[in-house]
Regions:
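N-terminal "arm"/small-domain region of PLP-dependent enzymes with the aminotransferase-like
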Residues: 1-53, 182, 281, 410
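Short beta-strand->loop structural element characteristic of the AMP-binding/adenylate-forming
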Residues: 117, 127-137, 372
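Conserved coil-to-alpha-helix start sites within the AMP-binding
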Residues: 112-118
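Helix C-cap/helix->beta junction micro-motif
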Residues: 124, 179-181, 367
Length: 436
């Protein structure tokens, strides 16, 4: 038996042990996590045994397939979803440099967001214009967005499809911004596999981003993707990812004398430097993942349809079990004309309720049910954002309540209906006051 086959047999044994449903009351029911079997382990081992760790053929295929899953043509694999947002806005800023000015630099963004959907806006010199979100869908408040889009100082919009619930007005926002010479970036980190108007999330935007962190719909361990419809945009993004380098060759052929393009020493830049492998056109970063992550991601993509089905089935089942407590809480729902790909099950305690989030989450955690808040909730409530807290003209009352009263539990494929029913039973017991 060859060493490679022997290793794969051991990996297969471990992989089968890895994928088990939690036992309610005995094992932790996570809010999310990776769903693996032996195929992911084998894909990773193949890359390790091949000996090429840098980005190569697996990464290029992963970029292409992920881009198509987000309604785009070209992808750039990066080391996280947060990096994807940064690279997306860096690329857009370069492309829209003639339209951005001191009097037109505001970017619309929901106040209830993940921090790194907001942070690149601030870090790259734009001014965030915060809008509120709706209870239930957690989408940006439509009237506020429309009012903001009519302002002369707005250049763009950046938002996440909240917790796997596509924003149905995305196409409308994109068309308004496009007509006005502005841009839209869709953060699809929580919504891979979701659709609006029967097309994938990511379709109606100038750039779409994704996270492949372990908690998300597919995983590569860590990782992210930024996707575009034009090759030029992909090359700009790759340059920002790869230290600002002008060369876009990739794969094992970069080790050849003339590079993967065969023109390494062709002097195509007029600066008296003949080796274009080391020409830097931008102030870039090192945001590269590795080939092994792409190999895992490709296997996960093949399972996406099943993952989405499991998430949505778990979500629907939990919702049916909790319908009796709608007087106390806002339960989540999707808008008409969208197909969700639920990341989690968010619950917001109503303002008039005597319940508290602390009571619910501490009680659930004591029963081995993992909970999370709605990420940052209203980001403006956090210390890092205090200096920009006065930058919005709109009421953020819903985001304020989400900051204090919203939590979420899991619906991911790693839990089954038995776990879902255990979650529901415990929530109902707490709400009824019978938490024994």
């Amino acid at each position: 038996m060859s060493k490679k086959i022997e290793i794969k047999k051991l990996v297969e044994k471990y992989g089968h042990d890895f994928s088990k449903y939690p036992r309610p009351g005995k094992d932790l029911i996570q809010y999310s996590g990776p769903t693996f079997d032996t195929s992911e382990f084998e894909a990773a081992i193949d890359v390790l045994l091949d000996g090429w760790f840098g980005l190569g053929e697996k990464a290029e295929e992963f970029e292409l397939q992920t881009a198509h899953a987000l309604g785009k043509e070209f992808g750039v694999f990066v080391n996280s979803g947060s990096s994807a947002n940064l690279v997306a806005l860096l690329t857009i800023r370069e492309l829209f440099k003639d339209k951005i000015s001191g009097s037109r630099n505001k970017v619309i963004v929901p106040a209830s967001s993940f921090p790194t959907t907001v942070n690149p806006i601030i870090q790259l010199g734009f001014e965030p214009l915060f809008v509120d979100v709706e209870f239930g869908t957690y989408a940006p408040v439509y009237d506020q967005v429309i009012a903001a889009l009519e302002r002369h100082d707005v250049i763009g919009m950046m938002f996440a499809h909240p917790l796997g619930n596509p924003v149905v007005q995305t196409k409308e926002y994109y068309e308004k911004l496009n007509k006005a010479g502005g841009f839209l970036i869709e953060d699809c980190c929580d919504c891979l596999g979701g659709k609006y108007l029967d097309v994938p999330v990511g379709t109606y935007s100038h750039a779409a981003t994704l996270s492949t962190y372990m908690a998300h719909h597919i995983t590569s361990g860590e990782g992210g993707m930024v996707c575009f419809n034009r090759k030029k945009h992909q090359r700009i993004a790759k340059s920002f990812r790869d230290w600002g380098r002008g060369c876009f060759c990739s794969g094992k052929d970069v080790l050849s004398v003339d590079g993967a393009c065969g023109k390494r020493f062709s002097c195509w830049i007029d600066n008296n430097v003949s080796d274009h492998r080391y020409i830097y056109e931008r102030l870039g970063y090192n945001l590269k993942p590795i080939e092994m992550q792409a190999a895992i991601g490709l296997v996960q993509l093949k399972k996406l349809e099943g993952f989405v089905k499991a998430r949505n089935n778990n979500f629907k089942h939990l919702g049916s079990l909790l319908s009796s407590i709608e007087g106390e809480v806002h339960l989540p729902y999707s808008s008409e004309f969208v197909t969700p790909s639920w990341f989690s099950y968010p619950i917001t305690i109503k303002k008039e309720s005597l319940l508290t989030r602390d009571l619910l989450t501490k009680s659930l955690e004591s029963k081995k049910i993992q909970t999370r808040t709605f990420f940052a909730g209203n980001v403006l409530k956090h210390p890092a954002y205090q200096k920009i807290a006065k930058s919005t003209p709109y009421s953020l009352k819903n985001s304020d309540l989400i900051y204090k009263n919203t939590f979420m539990v899991g619906v991911w494929p790693g839990i089954n209906f038995e776990a879902i029913e255990y979650i529901a039973d415990n929530i109902l017991s707490i709400v009824s006051g019978d938490n024994t």
